[in-house]
A protein has these predicted regions:
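Short, small-residue-enriched loops and turns at beta-alpha junctions
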Residues: 128-130, 160, 197-199
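Active-site pocket-lining segments that scaffold enzyme catalytic pockets across diverse folds
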Residues: 136-187
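A composition/biophysics-driven feature that prefers long, compositionally simple stretches
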Residues: 1-151
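Acidic/histidine-enriched ion/cofactor-binding microenvironments in catalytic or ligand-binding pockets
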Residues: 13-16, 110, 197-208
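Short, basic/aromatic beta-hairpin or loop at an interaction surface
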Residues: 184-197
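Beta-strand scaffold of nucleotide-dependent catalytic cores
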Residues: 35, 189, 202
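Flexible loop/turn segments at secondary-structure boundaries
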Residues: 43, 96-98, 176, 197-200
C-alpha cells in the first residue's frame, strides 16, 4: 500500500513522509515545538530515495527545532523527569470501531504503561476543530481542487461511450486531474456504471 501521512500531522507540519513525529511541550523544557525526522542513511537512500534533511524539514514546516526520530522517546522521558506533567495528548483517531490500532494508538498505550500517573487525552478533536477554519490560502486550494475535479469529470463525459470499461473511465479521470497538477486523488475513484452507480463505496471498477 502507498504510504499516507496522518492528515493532522500534515496539517501541522506540511510534511508527508513516514517515520516522523511532532512534540508540542507546554512545559519549561528548552524547546516547546520539536519535529522529529528520519536520519539520512546513504545506503538506504540508494534503494528508497532521499530522505528529508533537517534544513528541508525546517523550511517546509517552519519549525526551528528538528531532530532525528530515534531521540523522541528519550526527550519525552527527560521532560517528564524535569517537569510536573499532568496530562499528555495523543492524536488517537480511528475511522471505525473495528479498525486496527494506528501507530499513535500503540504509542499512547505504551505511554500509559510507562507513565500511569499522567492523564492520557485525545488531541484529535482539538486539531479537527482547527482544521475546520480555513485561511485564505486553504480556501484557494479548495477552489482549485474543485476546478480540477470538474475538468476530470468533463473528460469522463467526453470519452464515455457504450462498451467502455469502468476502469477506463477511471483512467480518463485520473489522467486529467494529474495533467492539471494534482498529485493524487483524495480517495479511490468510484467509476460505477449501471447498477454499480448506486453503491456508495463501490471500488472494483471492473464492469462495462
Amino acid at each position: 500500500f502507498d504510504f499516507e501521512a496522518n492528515h493532522h500531522f500534515f496539517y501541522l507540519t506540511g510534511l508527508r513522509r513516514e517515520n516522523m513525529a511532532l512534540v508540542l511541550a507546554n512545559t519549561h523544557c528548552p524547546a516547546h515545538v520539536i519535529l522529529f525526522i528520519e536520519e539520512p542513511i546513504p545506503d538506504m537512500e540508494r534503494w528508497t530515495g532521499r530522505r528529508v534533511t533537517i534544513d528541508e524539514a525546517r523550511a517546509v514546516s517552519g519549525i526551528d527545532d528538528v531532530r532525528y526520530i530515534d531521540s523522541v522517546d528519550s526527550l519525552i522521558s527527560r521532560c517528564i523527569a524535569r517537569e510536573t506533567v499532568e496530562a499528555a495528548y495523543f492524536d488517537c483517531y480511528r475511522n471505525a470501531m473495528g479498525d486496527v490500532d494506528s501507530y499513535n494508538m500503540h504509542k499512547a498505550k505504551r505511554f500509559m504503561q510507562a507513565y500511569p500517573a499522567i492523564a492520557l487525552k485525545d488531541a484529535h478533536p482539538m486539531i479537527a476543530a482547527m482544521r475546520m477554519v480555513k485561511d485564505e490560502d486553504e480556501v484557494k486550494t479548495l477552489e482549485r481542487a474543485i476546478t480540477v475535479t470538474d475538468q476530470g469529470l468533463r473528460r469522463v463525459l467526453a470519452t464515455l461511450e457504450p462498451g467502455r470499461m469502468e476502469y477506463q473511465q477511471q483512467a480518463e479521470f485520473e489522467y486529467e486531474i494529474r495533467m492539471q497538477g494534482a498529485e493524487r486523488v483524495s480517495f479511490p475513484t468510484i467509476a460505477g456504471s449501471g447498477m454499480n452507480g448506486c453503491m456508495l463505496h463501490y471500488g472494483t471498477n471492473q464492469c462495462k
